Amino acid sequence: MKKRPTSAYIHIPFCTQICYYCDFSKVFIKNQPVDDYLAALMEEVKFYDLPALRTLYIGGGTPSALSEDQLDYLLTNLEDLLDLSQLEEFTIEANPGDLTADKIAVLKKSKCNRVSLGVQTFDDRMLKKIGRSHNQAQIYETIAALKEAGFHNISIDLIYALPGQTMEQVVDNVAKALELDIPHMSLYSLILENHTVFMNRQRRGNLHLPNEDVESDMFDYILQELEKNGFEHYEISNFTKPGFESRHNLMYWDNSEYYGLGAGASGYIDGMRYRNRGPIQHYLKSIREKGHSRLHEEFLSQTEQMEEEMFLGLRKKTGVSIERFEEKFGISFEDRYGQVVRDLKNEGLLQEEDRWLRMTKKGLFLGDTVAERFIIED
């Protein structure tokens, strides 16, 4: 019998403010049927009858946009419905501006053991410029309050190559991030997505971004500075102190299956990738009628599974095991990708050691470009 996934992602689509760069499934929380949504989420959890979970991740949107009572309802009911006896990691995303002392107390009495904060930048002017609702002072207050409550597995997200951002500002951000004394950071370069404020500005010629050389210098500096301070660069955008890797995210990069629950959530079960309906009312109606809200379902061919194995695995510092690939897919790696690998090695983008393939530093900066080379038309 096929082993069932032991990870689940739960989506809370509500936000108190819509950030200018964000294209995730989200809505402004005011006047939304939040209680109905949380109740529907529990029905969806029951529908899937999940096995014992190893990792659980609540993302958004902004889970901390929920009121204290709503957050308590969410966490208490999840713990009642799910088997968390084998749980290793339970992450919740939060914003520094709305994670109050009362909400931290709710987290503290739950099984949540990891908090990921959407910091993005420490620069108050830049925070306003990108549509964030918190300020620098709130970042420090929230981290201090979490530590005081006993949370030590704390991660922050930072974005670089923001509109008008200089190298000096990146240097300052990295210094301030290191001062927080936390064990995990995710650093992303700004990517312009469709249907965002920033993309609309770009199309009108009103968005001034650092050029690719400056962005590359920023990436090099971040890498060098964090590694110098005891962080391991274990995935293209992620840095960890020993033992604090995001186990849930490693599950994605290992191309493992997982449940995706909530409006707009994606999941991967029984060889099928699926996406739930995004609009809240459509999600609620679907849960009432069917128990689930899957809209888009796609069974992956072996070719697609191999492509995903490569471009997800190469995101990690450890890279892709040729042996594991051949065991999983029952074909010769050399026959399938030998020429692609030789070309990428010659271009200085890939390296091989003990039948493991990993990206070079240059390859990491050009990550998506390298990944695309593994898409081969049969």
Task: Please name every model-derived segment.
Residues W356-T360:
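Minor-groove-contacting beta-hairpin "wing" of winged helix-turn-helix DNA-binding domains
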Residues C15, E257, D354-R355:
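Beta-strand-connecting loop/turn residues
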Residues K345-R355:
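A short, conserved structural fragment
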Residues I10:
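Conserved N-terminal Rossmann-fold NAD(P)-binding element of oxidoreductases
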Residues K3-P5, K26-Y48, A52-I331:
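C-terminal scaffold of the Radical SAM
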Residues L364-D378:
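Short, amphipathic alpha-helical interaction segments positioned at domain boundaries
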Residues P13-F24:
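Local cysteine-cluster metal-coordination motifs and their immediate loop/turn environment
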Residues I331-D343:
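Short amphipathic alpha-helical interaction segments
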